[in-house]
């Protein structure tokens, strides 16, 4: 349901991005705004509410350094993009299109858990038409490296840049010494405390792998 809704909303949101003064910044904002499509938080979200929320989100400043993120993206030869929820991955497509040529892998969960994206969701969202899709070999919410498969761990260890979507990935990877940028909306008190950002913040945080 959420993937179909997101695909219906995407063209109008892409038009907003293309007409913006800074399409990269707008694509980042949309990717974070997509984080509202979370059955664990907004299970009864209507299409009209989702469109309104994401159009409004394109005007919400991101708490973080978009320029630094852009500068990290530009030279990267191998990028790993960690997916979050099933419907929201549609809204990762504009940001995926801005990434440079080279090896880009989009990682989903290895098996269904809560509303996290799995392989069939990525295929339904058309992600495989843009980049390589892999699964992490795990059914844990978030990304627990000890539970992940060899293909994913090779991609994780070999990536010049890791783009991590959602709170679950932030909570499980924030202490890793890896070149990660975290994109998420602060939705719970635990993440509010850890990140130091207020509830509702649209966050873009650099991981420990960046000096």
Q: Where are each of the predicted segments found?
A:
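Electropositive, gly/pro-rich neighborhoods at or near active sites that engage anionic ligands
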Residues: 1-76
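C-terminal functional extensions of proteins
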Residues: 108-114, 121-211
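Residues at the starts of beta-strands that form the adenosine-phosphate
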Residues: 77-78, 102-105, 179
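Structural motif
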Residues: 78-80, 160-161
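Histidine-anchored nucleotide/phosphate-binding helix
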Residues: 82-105
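Loop/helix-junction capping segments adjacent to catalytic residues or to phosphate/diphosphate-binding pockets
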Residues: 63, 89-90, 113-116
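Short amphipathic alpha-helical segments and helix-helix/interface helices
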Residues: 70, 93-97, 119, 152-153, ...
């Amino acid at each position: 349901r959420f993937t179909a809704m997101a695909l219906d909303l995407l063209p109008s949101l892409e038009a907003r991005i293309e007409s913006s003064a800074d399409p990269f910044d707008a694509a980042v904002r949309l990717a974070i705004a997509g984080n509202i499509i979370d059955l664990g938080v907004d299970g009864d979200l209507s299409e009209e509410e989702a469109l309104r929320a994401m159009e409004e989100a394109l005007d919400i400043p991101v708490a973080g350094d978009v320029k630094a993120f852009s500068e990290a993206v530009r030279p990267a030869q191998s990028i790993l993009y960690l997916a979050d929820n099933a419907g929201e991955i549609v809204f990762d497509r504009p940001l995926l299109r801005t990434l440079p040529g080279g090896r880009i892998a989009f990682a989903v969960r290895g098996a269904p858990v809560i509303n996290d994206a799995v392989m069939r969701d990525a295929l339904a969202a058309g992600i495989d038409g843009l980049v390589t899709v892999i699964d992490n070999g795990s059914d844990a919410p978030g990304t627990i490296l000890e539970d992940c498969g060899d293909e994913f761990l090779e991609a994780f260890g070999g990536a010049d840049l890791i783009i991590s979507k959602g709170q679950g990935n932030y909570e499980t990877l924030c202490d890793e010494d890896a070149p990660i940028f975290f994109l998420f909306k602060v939705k719970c008190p635990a993440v509010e405390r850890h990140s130091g950002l207020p509830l509702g913040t649209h966050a873009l945080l650099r991981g420990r792998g960046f000096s």
